Amino acid sequence: MLSASEGEQTVRLARNTIESFLKDGEQSDSIDLPEVFGELRGVFVTLTKNGNLRGCIGHPYADSVLESAIVDSAISAATRDPRFPMVDISEMSDIIVEVTVLTQPELVDVLPDKLPEVIEIGRHGLIAKMGMYQGLLLPQVAPENDFDAIDLLNHTCLKAGLPQDAWLTGAQMYWFEGQIFKEVEPRGDIEENKFNSCCK
């Protein structure tokens, strides 16, 4: 688990990276960060503006060190999310930055009809995989949208471009947990959002 101070630094790194890139087209200079930023971690950066999603991209798997994963995800969330136009620097005073540091996804090894019984809302995020299709929902999505376990399974499959009941018909479901750090207001204090117990 990251400490509160380390979590705060994840969000500041994400914001500083975005603002530097939008101003100059360059990444901000590397700064001295705690040891955990050199560990392999999955991470997502989420941007919201006036309560609405403005960008969300990340690394589901621990394929990069945390610092690099945050930098890449932050720039991508602001400039490469295909659902939204590129963020303009003038918007950053209205955007809340959130960073979710992930545990390594693991296959949920139960019979499909038992999946709703083992998934814990607020604790588990999900990845649905079938063939070339893959989709992910972060742990905070379910409590933020009042989903139960079946809703979460259905929406994860839809995110993957699959039928919503694909979790019953052959899709592999992976779960993971996330430690969530978020600005209370744009450029404001940073708090850890705890929907449930986390993490391994």
UniProtKB/Swiss-Prot annotation:
Instruction: Name the Pfam families on file.
Output: AMMECR1
The protein's matches in PANTHER family, at most eight in alphabetical order, are given as: AMME SYNDROME CANDIDATE GENE 1 PROTEIN (PTHR13016:SF0), AMMECR1 HOMOLOG (PTHR13016)
Q: Sorted alphabetically, which Gene3D superfamilies does this protein's record hold?
A: Hypothetical protein ph0010, domain 1 (3.30.700.20), Hypothetical protein ph0010, domain 2 (3.30.1490.150)
Domain (AMMECR1) spans 5-192
Please report the name of this protein according to its UniProt entry: Protein Mbur_1344
Task: State the superkingdom.
Answer: Archaea
